[in-house]
């Protein structure tokens, strides 16, 4: 509650520029939490998580701009379309083992990114520029509070899910999948379900990004965004629920402020990740984060 109040004050009391940065931090936090459902709890390393983020925004903007649909109806239909698409992707990606899953997820993500960038109906390399937020969100403070509210609700839902028997099964499969199979658990279904749930939360983050940026753009499908999700979890700690929250905060601030200082900001981020992986292998917030030499 105190953190939510602090975010609300910081995003509404210090001007529009601060609000823009804080809204970006919130969206990246949700994106990182969604990825950690796969990466941290199930041990599934997806290299295509940007696809969920990007498709959420693109489908929403396309429905509003091309079909002239009411924004809230478009949001609902976007979730339905994403659910069907992610289910099909999950069935394909999880057909074999986790090694093939990693590369299949990357392949599908790259295919979607290239297809969207070449498809003029989706704006090509320019993207779709459309104000999807309703008129009552014209005030940046109202838009920020809306984004904050959605992220808080999603965070609570993910936290509740992380404490459920379902996630305990995911952790069991991560540690010893053969034992779960021996006990009669269908691990393929288990992994497909968490794949879809993770994608849905990432799609919500992408939809919020479309609200914030008044459109959907090819950068939201870029493979670099998938690696950012991994960095968030590695830096903060994939075994801690709030690890991706801290990781998302760090990554978002780096990408917002370091480019103003140096053009080599990605190198600094890479060096920081290297130090974390070498000295604190479980991340900054993990209870198992010990100094290793």
Residue ranges and their predicted role:
Residues 1-5, 175, 182-189, 258-293:
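Cytosolic-side transmembrane-helix boundaries in multi-pass membrane proteins
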Residues 11-67, 92-101, 170-182, 186, ...:
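Single transmembrane alpha-helix segments in multi-pass membrane proteins
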Residues 21-22, 26, 51, 72-80, ...:
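Hydrophobic alpha-helical transmembrane segments
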Residues 28, 57-58, 82-83, 106-111, ...:
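Residue-level recognition of pore/gate-forming positions within transmembrane alpha-helices
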Residues 67-110, 246-248:
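Alpha-helical transmembrane segments within multi-pass membrane transporters and channels
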Residues 76, 192-274, 278-279:
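Transmembrane alpha-helical segments in multi-pass inner-membrane proteins
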Residues 108-139, 167, 282-287:
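Extracellular/periplasmic helix-loop junction at the C-terminal end of a transmembrane helix
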Residues 138-217:
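Helix-loop-helix "hairpin" substructures at the membrane interface of multi-pass membrane proteins
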